[in-house]
Regions:
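Ubiquitin-like/PB1-type beta-grasp interaction modules and other compact soluble beta-rich domains
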Residues: 1-82
Length: 83
């Protein structure tokens, strides 16, 4: 299925990419992250296991088991903190 990926903050900087369209076989948020990590290189580093990454699907915060649908917009970003 085709999905639209949007990268934010340090993930965007690490990848050198703000957005891309992906033809993915991932069924949910967790399997999408695994698929992206498997690309290796900057993807493996930016989305490494243990590195906190938040996922939003169609602008709604997603859990690992949140399903993906054809044409979904998926945002990936680090947790935001402030003071």
């Amino acid at each position: 299925m085709k999905i639209q990926l949007r990268y934010f903050a340090s993930i965007r900087e690490d990848l050198g990419l703000a957005a891309e369209e992906l033809d993915s076989s991932a069924l949910d948020a967790a399997s999408l992250l695994a698929e992206l990590r498997a690309r290796g290189g900057a993807y493996a580093q930016a989305l490494a296991e243990g590195r906190p990454v938040r996922v939003a699907i169609n602008q709604v915060m997603a859990r690992a088991d949140t399903p993906l649908t054809e044409g979904a917009e998926v945002g990936l970003f680090p947790p935001v903190t402030g003071g």
